[in-house]
Structure formats: C-alpha cells, structure tokens
Amino acid sequence: LFGTKWAPTAADPSYGILYIILTSIIGTAVSILIGVPIALLTAVFLTEVSNKKLSAVVQPAVELLAAIPSVIYGLLGLMILNPVLYKLEKHVFANSATHQFTGGSNLLAAIIVLAIMILPTVINMSVSSIQAVPQQMRAASLALGATKIQTIFKVTVPAAKSGIMTG
C-alpha cells in the first residue's frame, strides 16, 4: 500500500499510493502557506484599516465565497486555471525534450484552488478573533507611542492569535 509503484492492471497488480499521499500533504501544506497570510492580512485590513462602508461591502462578499461548494471551486479551476497553466507550461518547457505536458492539471493548479478555497474561512475566523481583542489594549499601545501599524502587528494580531489558529 505504501509502495511507490502504481500498476493496477499489471499481471501482478501493485497499488502503491505513497506518492499520492505525499503529494496531498505537500499540496495542502503549500496552500496553507499561501492562503493563511493572505487571509490574515485581509482580515486585518477589514477590521483595522478600511472604512465601515468598504467593510460592509467586502464582508458579505467573503461570506458568500464561504458558501460556494468545493466542487464549484474545482470546476472553475478546471475550466479557467488549467488552460492558463497549460499555456504557461508550454511556454516554460518549449525546448524541453523530456517534459511530459499535463494540460495544466498539476499540483500548482490544486494548490491555487485550495488556497482560494480556504480564504473565506480563515478571513471570517480572523475577523472574529481580531474584533474580540479589547479596545483598551489598542488604546494602551497607542498611548505608549506605538504607531497604528505597530499596534496592529505587535498587539492586536498576537492577542488574537489563539482564535486565528483555531480557525
């Protein structure tokens, strides 16, 4: 089962799924490394930087994105992202004699789709956690001479870290 050879139709079938498992782990980890910082910075922007009007427009849009089924994200990735990545792949590997073209369906496409899929959930959890930080902590930081950016990244985000990590 944890072998590296996948030959289910051979005379002596082999069902090694080690590469499939490793690819899933790598794809998930990289999509988290891409998606979480983007989502956290978006949540900081929505709660600490933007005006109320913009937040009132963007927040429902983020919640709407959270309601989209994962199958739809996958379909959009297949229909939109794969052709773009295939063109990029043809351009990058134009002179390669050994490259097997994937048609755009590759780990990069999966990572991008997964990173987009986790954005709404992480944004919503981060917004809730940042809003739960007491206003007195922000006021104390500003009273001690910290700038707004320093207050956000040295006081507010660390105070909200446990709630953000839960999401």
Where do the PLM segments sit?
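Periplasmic/extracellular loop-to-transmembrane helix junction in inner-membrane transport proteins
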Residues: 1-30, 51, 100
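Residue-level signal for discrete positions within transmembrane alpha-helices
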Residues: 20, 24, 60-63, 67, ...
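Transmembrane-helix boundary motif in ABC transporter permease subunits
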Residues: 31-62
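Transmembrane helix-loop junction
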Residues: 43, 47-48, 79, 83, ...
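Transmembrane alpha-helices
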Residues: 64, 122-126, 148-167
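Generic hydrophobic transmembrane alpha-helix motif, especially the helices
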Residues: 65-111
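Glycine/proline-centered hinge or cleavage motifs at structural transition points of membrane proteins
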Residues: 69, 144-145, 158
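Membrane-helix/interface signature in polytopic inner-membrane proteins
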Residues: 126-139, 147
